[in-house]
Each structure stands twice: as C-alpha cells, then as structure tokens.
Amino acid sequence: MIFKSVRELNHHIKSNCVFISFGSKGTTYYEKTSNKVIKIFDMALNDSDYEYFEYKEIDFSRFKSAKNSTYLFPIDVIYLKDRVIGYSSELAKGSSLYRTNPLSINLDSLRSAFIKTLLDVKTISNNGILTDDLPYNTIYYPKGKKLYIVDTDDYSFSEMDSSLLYASNNRQIGNSLKMFLVDGYFDDVVSSNKYLYDLYKNGDFLTFLREYRKILSEIVSREVITLKDASGCVDKENRGNYVRLLK
C-alpha cells in the first residue's frame, strides 16, 4: 500500500479505518475494507524524526518464514512515497488481556489455549525469533480457546540455541498469563505461599496454573473452575502493577 502524501493517508484512515490503540511507536487501526489491522509509525511521518526511526521492508519480510497462527507478524508494508511508515497484519479475534476481567476466565479453556501456542512458540524459536513486550499485546479468544500475540514488529533475531530460545519465548508468554491471573487480585494468596510464589516468579505456566488452582480450591473448599469461584480471596486493597482497562 503506497500513499503519495500525508493528506491521502489521513483521508484513508478517516474514511476506512477505526481506531484501536496507540503506543510509543505508533497507532493501530482496524481497516474495514481489508478486515485487517494496520499500524502507522507516527514518528515516521515527520521528516526530522524519521532519520531516528527508519524501517525498511526487509525488517518485516524476515518474519515470513515463521508461519504460525499465534504470533501475528507483519504481512504487507505501508509506504508514504518511498518511506516505510507502517504495516498490515491479520485481525485477531478476542480481547486484549488487559481489557479482560480475570475472574471471568475458565481456567481449563485458558490452559488449552496455552497448550495450543506451544507448537507456534517452537516454530518461531526455530526461526531465531526472540519475542518481547507480551503483557499488553496478548489477546485471548475464549470461544476458540486461542491466544494471539500482536504488535510483533519490534521482535529481534537471536543467535541463541533454539532450545534456549524456546525456553525464553515460552517463559515470556507464561509470565504474561501469570501476571494477568494474579496481579491486583490474588497477590496475597500467592505471596503467602512460598511454593506458589516461587512458581509464580520462576516456574513454568502449566505447573503454576495447576498449583494455583489447587490452592485456591483448598481455600474456598470447592473446585475452582473460573477465578470468580475464588472471588472471596481477592485482595481488594491491592491494585497491582498490571494496568487493566476494564469496563
């Protein structure tokens, strides 16, 4: 997609796009005509800033060999004349974790969704890709028991052994989910149990989830299926560090 001027770009956005979010590097929109997401690097539109913020098409094409359904990598590049100013990617179903109430989560479904990601974690790791910044870029689609990772353009390539890279990428997505399930809600439960706290800080996600659920179930004297079943354990005084935008 090539735009001849900023005016043409702005007209396209106003006529065909819906605002989704903005971050430190750009603004994300839903493009109705293509049913895709586009991200525009706002700094790339400014001549004086561009020299410090230059992307090239090759920066995005390198992800194409890592075909998967979890990490939504750039598909097509967006140009302003000959300058790369953004990209398009597939639209993820579901809702961002930071917009999702953790009490509503069925833990069995989330476990299944995480297990589904493991093959894709292996795929990107075998392609040398190191992930980054997952807590606010993870989307959960409960109906399909599926996780998606968005805003992937800033991922790097690593010379790390693929098994070590897999462990790192696996840990990143697991830590993101642990934070979502605990922070600002069940901090007291986790911090008061040394075994559980160690799993929260250093353990793999599936082991943590199993023990977390077991301990919550013991506290409330019934099986915890959704975290709402353990809502009596919520620490109402602790707002946590994970910023949530809940309705």
What spans do the regions from the language model cover?
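C-lobe/activation-segment region of protein kinase-like
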Residues: 141-247
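Well-ordered, non-membrane alpha-helical segments in soluble/globular domains
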Residues: 48-61, 111-119, 166-174
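Protein kinase-like catalytic core scaffold
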Residues: 36, 70, 87, 148-151, ...
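Conserved structural core of kinase catalytic domains
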Residues: 69-114
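Conserved protein kinase catalytic core
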Residues: 45, 96, 157-159
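Conserved kinase catalytic-core helix
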Residues: 100-141
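A short, low-complexity linker immediately N-terminal to eukaryotic Hanks-type protein kinase catalytic domains
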Residues: 1-17
